[in-house]
Amino acid sequence: MAVIGIDLGTTNSCVAVMEGGDAKAIENSEGARTTPSIVAFTDSERLVGDPAKRQATTNAKNTIYASKRLIGRRYQDVKDIKSSYEVVSAKNGDAWIKVLGKEYSPSQIGAFVLEKMKETAERHLGHKVEKAVITVPAYFNDAQRQATKDAGKIAGLDVIRIINEPTAAALAYGLNKSDKQKVIAVYDLGGGTFDVSILEIADGVFEVKATNGDTMLGGEDFDHAIMDYLMDDFKKTTGIDLHNDAMAVQRIKEASEKAKIELSNRMETDINLPFISSDSTGPKHLSLKLTRAKFENLVDDLIQRTIEPCKKALKDAGISADKIDEVVLVGGMTRVPKVIQKVKEFFGREPHKGVNPDEVVAIGAAIQGSILAGDVRDVLLLDVTPLSLGIETLGGVFTPLIERNTTIPTKKSQVFSTAEDGQTAVTIKVYQGERKMAADNKLLGQFSLEGIPSAPRGMPQIEVTFDIDANGIVHVSAKDKASGKEQAIKIQSSGGLSDDEIQRMIKEAEQKAGEDEKRKKFIELKNNGENLVHSTEKSLNEYGDKIPNSDRLEIENAIRDVRDALGNSDVESVDILQQKVDHLMKVSMKLGEALYGNANNTSSTESTTTNNNNEEDSKVVDSDYQEIDKKDGK
């Protein structure tokens, strides 16, 4: 069974699969190979992708976009993020999203998008899909990776590997290339995150030497730069502040994104938003010409922010920019001319443009899926952990055990002991990050080692092992060195979803899938009902005088019943609607029977007349023939 590759992006998502030795991105039900990572809620249904995006202007508060920026993050870290929807703090301190009175974890929102990707693949392949490789930004920490894996689980997928986006892109770029050893840089500027990875490719071995990035830098920030400029200009011109007008902000967001895209190919673009607001003097319109030069000026600091991670990645890899053989551009934002120019200036070479920046990550994930399934051989992928892993030691200092850019999977052990006489439990706090003080890094969890035999301080020898798997996810174990027995460890995660929460969300997803199927059936039935009413009324107007009044009245009553049932938007009324439609279909057949009956009678009459005429004609001919014979006989 095929293993699909999914690029779960901030702005757009993509799914790919290996077919006949080649990986290809799959078109969704709307005919596009990328799907907006947008989820919207109405009183009656949930929308994903393009349908959600199309209604965003009129339903801004209930339309969720860029939720990837919240996944695996604490509320305190993201409370200042600009969004049209409400971000709240969950019980465990994580950032969740509140819509129509209900709270959703970012993993759930991601799962809705993954379900769409799963359905897209299943429609293309013609069978169920269970296994997937999902990509994440290289600079995602453990909590963000685990939350992404949870999203896959909620969506009904067995996520067999989490792979870094730049690494996936390198895999798609370098597979089947016969070149000798190459050192490449993957510059990945997407909708919400930025990553840069330095890789060495040789004889089918893809080895990541170093990675760096910024998980809060991407196309969303470019959009906001334009949005702020437009709203500030509008306020100066009219005195009206649009920041608190959700519908206006959504319209400006869409216009800003469109302008950003157009300015990649044009030197200027017009932004026109009529009736964006009003005051006592009447309606107000937002109309402005945005040049590429002005746009580049607005986002120059954002583009410049990508350079420092590039410098750090090169330093960690131990090479200089002039030693890079190829620079591969990934992510939709790398179409911006100023970005291309900045990359060229920094690396001193023209970037490689032979890959589709929107699809290459998903294609790489599909290739990795085939490698894990054993379908693609002689390819080895060696990735690294993007952040250091360590513990809090005396004075709140962060002591790394596994340094950043260590090849994964990896394992390292450290022996700990007690700080006081007779101590029978020790709490160890595990952090991930690069700051010197533990509190400034990401707390992954704390370990309570209980049941330690009472002894003088410093005597117990407890070996704690930190293990980072191929997904970049951290695992911890511990044992008492004196006895060799494993000790019980209670891990109290600082956040994330519990197993019970994940199972609840899986059940909700399954239930929602059933509801979605019922709604789909309901909508199809309503369409059929409306078409039946229209065609029956048309036939009744044209041929109603050809049937008995009792039949006509019965058909009119059936039409009225269907029309009344169509006015009910409750999905649970699908059975009632089905009965009404079936009844109308049955009684309307009387109209058809009458029409065809009349047609047959007319046809029969015409046939009889024709036959009689033929007989008379035959007699005339015979008579003439006989007369001719008589003449010939004379």
Curated annotation (Swiss-Prot):
UniProt biased composition (Low complexity): 600-613
UniProt cross-references to PROSITE patterns, sorted A to Z: HSP70_1, HSP70_2, HSP70_3
Family, as annotated: Belongs to the heat shock protein 70 family.
Region (Disordered): 597-634
NCBIfam families for this protein: PRK00290.1, PRK05183.1, prok_dnaK
GO MF annotation terms: ATP binding; ATP-dependent protein folding chaperone; unfolded protein binding
Transmembrane segments: none
Protein task: Acts as a chaperone.
Alphabetical keyword list: ATP-binding, Chaperone, Nucleotide-binding, Phosphoprotein, Stress response
HAMAP family named in the record: DnaK
Top-rank taxon: Bacteria
Residue spans of biased composition, Basic and acidic residues class: 616-634
Gene it is expressed from: dnaK
Listed CDD domains: ASKHA_NBD_HSP70_DnaK-like
UniProt induction comment: By stress conditions e.g. heat shock.
Pfam families per record: HSP70
Residue numbers bearing the Phosphothreonine modification: T193
Record-given protein name: Chaperone protein DnaK
